[in-house]
Amino acid sequence: MIIRWNRIEAMNQKMITQTKMTRRILLRVAYDGMNYHGWQLQPNAATIEGELNRALCALTGEEIVVTGASRTDAGVHALGNVAVFDTTSRIPAEKFSYALNQRLPEDIVIQSSKQVADDFHPRHCDCRKTYEYDILNRTFPLPAYRNTAYFLYGTLNIEAMRRACQAFLGEHDFASFCAAGAQVQTTVRKIYSLEVECRPLTEAGTPVPPASGEAVNAADGK
């Protein structure tokens, strides 16, 4: 009787340990930053990090704080920022994206979620970031682009812009570009590529489509 009781107690203890095992989950996040004061958590201000923390706490019942790869500024958008968090929740890693999207505002969408190594850190990993800056170069601005592109009237010398971009390639100290009090370990960054691309708009101000509607329907099997 005593031996069996000890065995059951050990099995129960093992089950508790397995249940509370901590996992690190990676989120790929897209968002429209116009309604937020940047990524980083701030008191009495709406931020991307704050919304993610709130949704995760509501979902798991745990006090969770995410760690992001890029702490974007106010009004900055992202197509695939990366964040991680630790949890003891038993929700399958790939299901977090679906569950969180039910709890997040419509301008923040989790594109994917997966489990990563416990020591993975989005700001310390050997990875590259891609930034895109859009310039709306035409006679009049377009309201549809007011939050996603910088309006510039006048003719741009594209070839001169491309030549100037070459000066930024390689490793440089970007301390002069940082805001006062920026908390970073180093201001040295390496630029691997920098391209200027022209994308024409139609007279109506919409991008020239790469494929017609008929081609899209064909791809959908219609």
Task: Tell me the role of every PLM-derived stretch.
Residues 5-8, 12-222:
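Structured-RNA-binding interfaces characteristic of tRNA pseudouridine synthases
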